[in-house]
Amino acid sequence: MNTTIRILLSFCFLNLVGAALAQPDSIVLRDINWDKNAPAGMNELFIPSSGATIAGLIYRANGVQKHPTLIILHGYPGNERNLDIAQVVRAHGWNVIYFDYRGSWGSGGQFSFANCVQDVVNVAAFCKKYTDSLRVDTSNIVLFGHSMGGWVCLKSLAQLPGIKKGFALSTWDIYGDFKDVKTEQQMMERARQGGNYFVLNTPLQELFKPVVDHPSFYKIQNDTTALASKQIIMLDEHHGNSELADTLRRSNRNYFNYEVWQTDYPFTNKRISLINKVLAFLDK
């Protein structure tokens, strides 16, 4: 084979590889070459949160330096944990922290939607306190939440001035689902539609009564001022959050992206596209 043909074939091959890498529905992963002094790994975390202890874990990135860190917030009750995202993000050079809110999946304390938000604030404080041992770069922490975790992501992002980015996936608009409820019977009928989970230690009546009694706290639109300077992605599989997204977009002075994909609630057929969107957001 002469030199000209070799060069031409090499050029074609590189173009094909480049095109494949550019596709949003493909991803290239490589095994991690362990740093002998600080290899990538995983550790359990026991995090104090308002007098209780919540269980979590950290996927440690490779290397002795402090790493940017993604905090993953699960939904209600949290069957989809998005740990496939965690593995790829860790390989991308980031730490990833996953935890179970108070009163969920064996964590101590009482489960409530408001407590979930405060738990994120407490996890961020934990990262700051143990920044050296956890090797967390506290200047670059990003929140990612799914369903209820999307709501928690936006609510806690509004309370954490040091965290600049949030990715809300299929956000549960808790306020929107209960704003027209007039009686306790209506509230319980609506609450039961979401299931009654033994992995959450709060009865439905106690869990949802604050939503009806104090709706302003649960209304994300009331946090537009605090969220105006943040970088936010909202990604849905339905159009139910379009009004909320429009409100946040109009007030945002930094970066706001809202998309609706043709998929299901856990984004089953779009995992690679989702991971690529997360990575691009982390790198932004």
Annotate each language-model stretch with its function.
Residues Q23-V64:
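N-terminal cap/lid segment of alpha/beta-hydrolase-fold proteins
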Residues G75-V88:
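The serine-hydrolase catalytic nucleophile loop
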Residues L134-S147:
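Alpha/beta-hydrolase fold nucleophile elbow
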Residues Q205-V278, D283:
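Serine-hydrolase catalytic core
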Residues F111-L134:
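Alpha/beta-hydrolase active-site loop
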Residues V89-G108:
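Conserved alpha/beta-hydrolase
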Residues K66-G75:
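Short beta-strand element of the alpha/beta-hydrolase
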Residues P24-D25, A158-E206:
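Hydrolase active-site cap/lid region
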